[in-house]
Each structure stands twice: as C-alpha cells, then as structure tokens.
C-alpha cells in the first residue's frame, strides 16, 4: 500500500422504496435503451470474435501452420481425449499468441474499438443517459469474459437504472448533487426504532436522462432504515422486479469507506465450511462447519422452512390444476357455443387447447370483460371465477416465495456473522456453484429431489454470506481444492467406504468407525489449510 494511503473497501446498502411519483415513461424508455444497447454489444462482440478468429486462421495459414481450431478438429476426429491439454493443441495456442502483435490484427482491433465507440455514440444520440450506458458496458465487459454470451430479453417488470460516480462523491454532498439528490436524515433518528420508523422516509430525486442539457428528474420515496456511513459514494441504482401483479422497488447505494481495522486474533483459529445439500432428520442441511477449536455444527433449514417452500410448490400445482380445468371447460363451450362467436373471439381462441400460460387466459378475460358476447354467461362466468381465484393464489405464491428467500438469506447472514466474530479465517471449497446449477438444469443424472433441495438450500447464497461476513471484518478467506474431501478419512487419510450420494455416514475400515461425510469434508479442508499454512 502506498505511503499515506488508507485501506478502503466498498459496501452496498439496499433500501426499500415506492414506485416513482412521476416519469415512469422515462424510466421504461431508459430501461428499453439499456436492453437494446446490451444486445447490440453482444451482437457486435459475436461478429468481431468471428472476424478475429478468421484473421488469425488466415495468418496461421500464410505461415504454413495449423490454427488451434484446426488442430482441435483434427485431434477430435482422431478420437483423442483431453484435447485442450494435448501438446499439439497447446503448441498451436502458443503459436497463435505470437500472432497477437501482427500489424493486421492490431489494425482490426483498432477498427473494432472504433465500432464500439460509434455504437455508444449512436445510443447516446437516442437518449441513453451516460451513467446508464457506462453501467451496461460494465455488465457487458464482465459477461464477455465467458465464452458464451447471451442476449437479454426486455421486460418492463424487471430492470435497473444507475448513476455512477467514477470519481466518487462525498456522502455529505449526496443531497445536492446534479445526478442524485438523496436527503440524509439526522443521525439522531436511528437511536430508537419508533423515531426511525417515523422519519426514515425521504424523497430521492433521481436523474433519468438529460433534455437539452437539463436534468430530467423522477422522485422516488425511499425508506432509509439504517444510517449510511460517511465515505465516498460510488453508485446509486434504482431496481424493480415483479412480485405477482405488482412491482417491488429498491434503491441501492454503494459507498467506499475506510477498511476495517486489522482484527485482533480471537484465539480460536480458522473455521472450515463444507457446502452441500441433503435431506436430514429435522430439515434440509446446507453445509457443515468445523473450527480449529474443535467446535462444529450443521447449517440447516428447519422442517418448518421446508414446509413453507413446499407450500410454494403446492400453490403452483393448484394453479395448474385450475388452469387445466378452465381450459377443458372453455374448449368444450367454444366447440358448441349457444350463439355465433364474434370474429375477434373466434380468432383469439382458435389455439386455446394449446395454451399453457395463465397470462394468455388473463389477457382473454380482460378483453372479454370489455367486449361481452351474447349468451356468454356460462363461459364468461368460468373465466371470471378462474381469474379471481388465480390472482389470489398467484399473489399468495409469489409473496410466500419472496418471503422464504429473504428469510433464508437472513438466517445465513446471522450464522455467517456469528462465525466471523468467533474465528480468524474462513476456509471454503473452491468450485463453481453456478456451473453445478447449470449442469443440473441441463439434464444431469441428479435425481429430481436432490435438484429441488439444491434450489431450496441455495449454497451460493450461503457462501456469499460467509465470504462477505469475513471480508467486512478484515479477515482472510481461503479457497481450497475440494477433491476427495468427502471420500478421504480426515483422521487416517484412508478411503471411506459407502455411496456418498445415498449415505450420510461413510465407514473407515482403518479407523473402524463411521463418519458424517459433511463433517469429514470440513475437517479435511481444515487439515489441508493447516498443511498449506505450515509450508509458508
């Protein structure tokens, strides 16, 4: 760290909000432009990747060499395994790197950069606010690190707008800035709950875009339930997402503050956490922790929590049953209506037996409600009754789902804070939870029940809570290779006997005892961390 510089870190604060009091059209316009800009960047990147690949292949051919793609296809046709580590493929990649400084490639890259700048200018001319296109570019640059880029679907029911402070803005000036004006309440209101609840609501002015260099503001009621720290503001963003038939609004404030002081040792050493999900007696296990002081325990959602998550699924099932019954009854009525159908109704419902979305039936109800048909009482009554019941069940389902997700997150945060206070370092497995989730969705051999339990346990939420809790307190987080942590005995190093997918407790022939496989994995992580530390 340079002399005289203080360690700093970034903290994000999220607050509840109400819908903007005006300017919703401008909000949706910016959201649409953001989506279009992101998709245009994706389209451009995919095309530019093809151009770079083709040019590199031509340069390699001119040199009389095979490109990495050609080597890959040749080895694949020959039945080789592990091609990306094959010496010929590795050598081809190294040869390609030598071409990166070729004048023709540098010229192409320069032209492609200018194309991106021109695209930015074109969207700026369309009215996309500068902070929003910078925010989109930040998200895109992160996404383009992945080999697979995906387009985004526009939805008015979910989105965000952002104001970025690249140079930073002192928090004391956030109430009078030209981009965001967020009045900060007197700190005295946070001394007791009653006073805080009475005075936490403030009106934030948020700049959506500029019109002839003048700001176009929207006013958003925000509930500052906790005090914002003194520091440097880096970002203020407005978020919304749909919960059933209404929008839930939040405001996020990102503040750069002085780093936490160096934590004094607790004397209890490190704690290792093995992440996993399995049904156990009394609930759903999401992980197991073991400390160097010998303490340990499972991280689990209770039976009551499981029942509530199951209730969400039950509500969805009930809605599906009601929808199928409605579809069958309406189809029968439409086949033999008591009076000729108007053209719009016949055209609208000609594919009704294939409809699967409740939204299509709801749209049909809204139109039928304003364009009643002669002798339609029976069919319209069915549709009206279904719409009323389904709206209630939809609200029940969506609110319960969000409630349980927030409850789970809070439980994980409380546990993470407790461990971070008690221990000096965190040890977790280094593996890609997102890839595991995508594999589950892509048709893996994982049983449906295990896939469902993974979704409920949400190990990524648990890991994020743990990592954030230790990082906020200035304590290190170490990620270790998880290979064989479950199947190797932590006590003797021998192989455990049993099927980890079916049995919780595995047997060690050497120790002649059974071990909880999750506790065993956590102890192996702890032992490996100690071995690594001893080598330093």
Curated annotation (Swiss-Prot):
Pre-crRNA processing is inhibited by EDTA. Keywords: Antiviral defense, DNA-binding, Magnesium, Metal-binding, Plasmid, RNA-binding, Transcription, Transcription regulation, Zinc. It comes from the Bacteria. Zn(2+) binds at residues 489, 492, 508, 511. Residues 1-59 are annotated as: Recognition domain (REC1-N). Residues 482-516 are annotated as: Target nucleic-acid binding (TNB). Residues 160-257 are annotated as: Wedge domain (WED). Residues 106-159 are annotated as: Recognition domain (REC1-C). Residues 517-536 are annotated as: RuvC-II. GO terms for molecular function: DNA binding; metal ion binding; RNA binding. Coiled coil: none annotated. The keyword Secreted does not apply. Residues 271-481 are annotated as: RuvC-I. Residues 258-270 are annotated as: Linker. Residues 60-105 are annotated as: Recognition domain (REC2). It holds the Pfam family Cas12f1-like_TNB. InterPro entries: Cas12f1-like_TNB. CRISPR (clustered regularly interspaced short palindromic repeat), is an adaptive immune system that provides protection against mobile genetic elements (viruses, transposable elements and conjugative plasmids). CRISPR clusters contain sequences complementary to antecedent mobile elements and target invading nucleic acids. CRISPR clusters are transcribed and processed into CRISPR RNA (crRNA). Has a bilobed structure, with a recognition (REC) lobe and nuclease (NUC) lobe. The REC lobe (residues 1-257) is formed by the discontinuous recognition (REC) and wedge (WED) domains, while the NUC lobe (residues 271-536) is formed by the discontinuous RuvC and target nucleic-acid binding (TNB) domains. The crRNA-single-strand target DNA duplex is bound in the central channel between the 2 lobes while the non-target single stranded DNA is bound to pockets in the REC and RuvC domains. Part of a type V-M CRISPR-Cas system. This is CRISPR-associated DNA-binding protein Cas12m. It comes from Allomeiothermus silvanus (strain ATCC 700542 / DSM 9946 / NBRC 106475 / NCIMB 13440 / VI-R2) (Thermus silvanus). The gene is cas12m.
């Amino acid at each position: 760290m340079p002399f005289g510089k203080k360690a700093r870190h970034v903290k994000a604060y999220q607050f509840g909000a109400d819908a903007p009091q005006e300017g919703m059209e401008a909000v949706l316009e910016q959201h649409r432009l953001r989506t279009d800009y992101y998709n245009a960047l994706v389209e451009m990147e995919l095309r530019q990747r093809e151009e770079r690949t083709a040019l590199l292949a031509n340069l390699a051919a001119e040199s009389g060499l095979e490109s990495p793609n050609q080597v890959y296809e040749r080895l694949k046709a020959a039945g080789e395994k592990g091609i990306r580590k094959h010496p010929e493929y590795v050598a081809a990649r190294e040869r390609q790197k030598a071409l990166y400084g070729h004048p023709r490639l540098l010229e192409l890259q320069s032209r492609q950069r200018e194309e991106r700048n021109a695209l930015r200018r074109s969207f700026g001319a369309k009215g996309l606010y500068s902070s929003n296109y910078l925010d989109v570019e930040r998200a895109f640059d992160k996404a383009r690190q992945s080999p697979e880029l995906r387009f985004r679907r526009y939805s008015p029911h979910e989105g965000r707008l952002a104001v970025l402070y690249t140079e930073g803005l002192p928090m004391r000036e956030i109430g009078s800035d030209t981009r965001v004006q967020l009045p900060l309440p007197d700190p005295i209101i946070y001394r007791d709950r009653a006073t805080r609840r009475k005075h936490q609501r403030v009106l934030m002015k948020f700049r959506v875009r500029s019109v002839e260099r003048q700001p176009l503001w929207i006013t958003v009621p925000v509930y500052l339930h906790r005090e914002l720290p003194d520091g440097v503001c880096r970002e203020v963003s407005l978020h919304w997402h749909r919960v059933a038939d209404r929008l839930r609004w939040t405001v996020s404030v990102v503040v750069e503050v002085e780093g936490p002081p160096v934590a004094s040792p607790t004397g209890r050493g490190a704690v290792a956490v093995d992440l996993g999900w399995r049904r156990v007696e009394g609930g759903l296990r999401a992980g197991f922790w073991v400390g160097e002081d010998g303490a340990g325990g499972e991280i689990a959602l209770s039976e009551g929590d499981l029942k509530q998550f199951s209730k969400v699924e039950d509500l969805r099932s009930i809605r599906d049953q009601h929808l199928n019954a409605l579809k069958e009854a309406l189809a029968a009525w439409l086949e033999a209506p008591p009076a000729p159908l108007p053209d719009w109704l016949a055209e609208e419902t000609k594919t009704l037996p294939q409809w699967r979305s409740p939204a299509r039936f709801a749209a049909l109800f809204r139109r039928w409600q304003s364009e009643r048909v002669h002798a339609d009482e029976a069919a319209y009554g069915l549709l009206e009754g279904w719409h009323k019941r389904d709206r209630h069940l939809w609200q029940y389902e969506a609110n319960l789902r969000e409630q349980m997700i927030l409850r789970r997150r809070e439980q994980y945060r409380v546990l993470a804070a407790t461990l971070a206070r008690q221990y000096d370092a965190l040890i977790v497995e280094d593996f890609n939870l997102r890839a595991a989730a995508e594999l589950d969705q892509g048709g893996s051999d994982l049983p449906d029940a295990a896939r469902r339990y993974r979704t409920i346990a949400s190990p990524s939420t648990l890991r994020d809570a743990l990592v954030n809790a230790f990082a906020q307190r200035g304590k290190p987080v170490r990620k270790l290779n998880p290979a064989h942590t479950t199947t190797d005995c932590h006590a003797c190093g021998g192989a455990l006997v049993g099927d980890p997918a079916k049995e919780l407790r595995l047997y060690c022939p050497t120790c002649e005892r059974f071990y909880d496989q999750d506790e065993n994995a956590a102890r192996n992580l702890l032992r490996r961390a100690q071995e690594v530390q001893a080598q330093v």
